[in-house]
Structure formats: structure tokens, C-alpha cells
Regions:
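Alpha-solenoid helical repeat scaffolds
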Residues: 153, 157-160, 164-166, 202, ...
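Conserved, well-structured interaction surfaces
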Residues: 45-59, 81-158, 179-187, 196-208, ...
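Short coil/linker segments at helix-helix boundaries
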Residues: 160-182
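Active-site beta-strand/loop architecture of penicillin-binding DD-peptidases
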Residues: 42, 361-389
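Bacterial N-terminal signal peptides that target proteins for export
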Residues: 1-9
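Acidic donor-binding segment of Leloir-type glycosyltransferases
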Residues: 193
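An aromatic- and glycine-enriched ligand-binding surface/loop that stacks and positions planar moieties
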Residues: 22-84, 161, 197-198, 213-368
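C-terminal motif of bacterial Sec signal peptides marking the signal peptidase cleavage site
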Residues: 18-20
Length: 389
């Protein structure tokens, strides 16, 4: 009996000790969470930079969006050996889950919008200390501009997209927008107009550094494009008047050499409202790996290799032949071909059309050096996307 009492007492004491223990809550400092993040101005800026980082994805401005916007326009065409891509630009949709024409752009535009929403959900938190109120307002305006930028292209590509202004959560339910694409586009554009008008009030007129961040002119330019999509011509005109005749006149003007707008060496010039900054030090920019992201590709681009002439790259999208013919319909006052054609396109007859430019090289070679077939000699490649002129 005594032995039983001793054993029972031992278990009772152990149970009491275990029951009174406090749970030790250890945070993993090597992994970020919402509980640890969004506490400082640096956190907000890091979140903002994550939105900018979405420029450098295949589905956005590193590669595929050019195929979509140019290839599906009247002046673009694809003769790519990749059948799905070729047919996509001709509105032949045999695979709605085609990664290059649909999935990557949809996914990565939404990722950018969700990241912007995260910044906007936290930036008004009074517990976060900023260098100044102007700093906070500028950062908020940047987030609104970025969200509007991505939404603009979402609507112009898909028309019928849901308007999501908060960070996504697991409890979110799909939006039912079937049968009302035009009305939904108006809803989205109206919200973007409101956001950009607010951003205009708080973005700086110009930036002495950080040229990759938007200014008032960037916001006015994007707002004008949205107004035009919305067929609000008078409001669009007001935006352009601010740029050309108003306060923006001190920043923006026409280039003395208009061809500078077609040259990668004269970027961010006086005609530029906003430019995405790419690095030629890592110009391939192949971000889609088995692990999804390649940290070494975050400032590069696949623009040139995607649209370069046959034999140099993938030539996934190029110009329609009628562009050349249309340019040549009207001569300059001295009887020459329109010089804009020379800076826009590269084609077999360019040397004859522009004898004032006898050594027309692209990536170190003349057209004849590529020894194209008779059929390929009728093709027209987009010269302005190269980094060789």
C-alpha cells in the first residue's frame, strides 16, 4: 500500500509540474512573417521594392508581354516555330493554359497587385515611424501608381478582371464576373483614376535619384491612357496639357534628335515619362527556373533574344510587312524615305532604301551575312528592341 501511495504521489507531482509549464514561443528569425514584418519604414520600402521586382519576370516586362501586345496587334505577327505561340498571336486558342500567352502574365500581374496591396494595407499604421510624413505619402503614392500600372494592363489584355484592393487571404472566394466585361472594366478604371489622382498630389515633380520610381509626370501619363480607354477624352486632354503646357513643361520637352527615342544609349531622356530600368550586364534575365526564381536574373531582360532576327534568337514576334510599305508611301520633303522606318525596322531592302546609312549592322552583321531564304528575305524584324543600335 505504501509503495502504491509513493508511486501515485510521484505521478501527481509530475503532472502538476507539467501542467504549470509555460509554452515557450520561439520565433524563427530566419523566416519572415506578418507578425515580424511591416514594423518599420525599411519594411515598407522592402515591400515596395518587391512590387518593382515584378517588372523583371517573363510574364511582365522581361519578355512575354511584348509578344502579347505586339504580336496580337495589327502591326505585329509571329512566325515562330513554337506552334502554340505562333497561333496565339493569330487568336487561335487551342490551349487556354498556354504558359507564354496566358498563365505567366496572369499570374505575375496578380502577384504584383497583391504585393502592392500588402504595402497599402500596412503603410497607414500609426505604429510605423517614417523619416517624415512626406516620405510616407510618397511611398503610398508609389504603391498606388504601381497597382494602377498593373491593373491597366490586366484590363487591356483581359477586360473582365476582378477589382481586389486588399491583400489576398485563404478565405477569399472567386468573383463571378461572367457576362459583364465592359461594365467591370469601367469599375476598375474608375478606381484607378481615383488612385492616380491621389498619387499625383503626393508624388514629386522630379527625382534627383531613384529614377526608376514614378513622378507626377508618370502618374499623369498613366492616367491619360486610362482616361482614353474609358473614352473620357476631355480629362485625358487635361493630363496631356499638364505635361506639355503646364507644370510638366519644366521637365518634359521634345528631343532635339527624335531618333534618340529609338536608341538604348539615350534612355530616360526629356520625352520619357517613365521607364523600366534594365541591366545589360545580365541581359538574359531568365527568371523561370525549376525553383521559379533565379536571384541573378532580377534586373536582366529577354526582350532582345525574344524578338531578335532569325538566327540570332527566338524571333517570337516581328513586324508585319505592310508597315514598311506604309512608311514608304510618303516621302520626306527632299524625296527620301521616312527616316522613322530606318530606326523602327530591319529588313532586306533597308540598305537600298537608306543609302545614307551604308553599314547597317545588327549585332555585328549585315542582313546579307545571315543568308536568309527568299521567304525569310520578306520578313521584317523590330529594330527598336535591339541593344545594338
Amino acid at each position: 500500500m505504501k509503495r502504491f501511495i509513493k508511486i501515485f504521489a510521484t505521478f501527481f507531482i509530475a503532472a502538476c509540474c507539467l501542467g504549470s509549464c509555460d509554452v515557450l514561443d520561439i520565433q524563427n528569425e530566419n523566416g519572415l512573417s506578418t507578425g515580424m514584418f511591416w514594423k518599420t519604414q525599411d519594411d515598407i520600402n522592402s515591400g515596395l521594392n518587391a512590387v518593382y521586382a515584378m517588372f523583371y519576370r517573363q510574364g511582365t516586362w522581361t519578355r512575354n508581354i511584348y509578344t502579347q501586345l505586339n504580336g496580337m496587334a495589327d502591326d505585329g505577327v509571329s512566325y515562330a516555330g513554337w506552334t502554340e505561340l505562333n497561333e496565339w498571336t493569330k487568336f487561335k486558342y487551342t490551349n487556354y493554359n498556354f504558359a507564354e500567352g496566358q498563365v505567366k502574365m496572369w499570374r505575375e500581374h496578380w502577384t504584383a497587385i497583391n504585393r502592392a496591396n500588402q504595402v497599402l494595407d500596412h503603410i497607414d499604421d500609426s505604429a510605423i515611424s517614417f523619416d517624415s510624413e512626406d516620405t510616407r505619402l510618397d511611398m503610398k503614392a508609389q504603391a498606388l501608381w504601381l497597382r494602377a500600372f498593373y491593373y491597366y494592363y490586366m484590363v487591356t489584355m483581359w477586360d473582365n478582371v476582378p477589382l481586389i484592393l486588399k491583400t489576398s487571404s485563404a478565405s477569399d472566394k472567386p468573383s463571378n464576373l461572367e457576362g459583364q466585361p465592359e461594365e467591370q472594366a469601367k469599375v476598375v478604371f474608375t478606381q484607378l483614376e481615383t488612385d492616380l489622382l491621389w498619387a499625383i498630389e503626393h508624388l514629386p515633380l522630379k527625382r534627383e535619384k531613384d529614377k526608376a520610381r514614378p513622378t507626377k509626370g508618370s502618374a499623369y501619363g498613366l492616367l491619360a491612357k486610362i482616361y482614353m480607354q474609358h473614352k473620357n477624352w476631355q480629362e485625358a486632354q487635361k493630363c496631356f496639357e499638364w505635361i506639355i503646357e503646364g507644370e510638366g513643361k519644366s521637365i518634359y520637352s521634345l528631343e532635339s534628335k527624335w531618333e534618340n527615342n529609338f536608341n538604348c544609349k539615350t534612355e530616360n531622356n526629356c520625352e520619357s515619362l517613365y521607364e523600366i530600368q534594365f541591366s545589360l550586364c545580365n541581359y538574359v534575365g531568365f527568371d523561370q527556373t525549376d525553383n521559379y526564381l533565379d536571384a541573378n536574373a532580377q534586373v536582366g531582360t529577354q526582350i532582345e533574344v525574344n524578338q531578335s532576327p532569325k538566327g540570332l534568337g527566338w524571333n517570337n514576334v516581328e513586324s508585319n510587312r505592310w508597315i514598311v510599305d506604309y512608311f514608304k508611301r510618303e516621302k520626306t520633303v527632299d524625296g527620301k524615305n521616312d527616316p522613322r522606318l530606318f530606326y523602327t525596322c530591319w529588313y532586306a531592302q533597308a540598305e537600298a532604301d537608306f543609302p545614307e546609312h551604308p553599314d547597317q549592322l545588327i549585332y555585328g552583321k549585315k542582313w546579307a551575312d545571315y543568308k536568309y531564304s527568299a521567304t525569310d528575305n520578306q520578313r521584317v524584324f523590330i529594330k527598336k528592341y535591339s541593344t545594338d543600335v
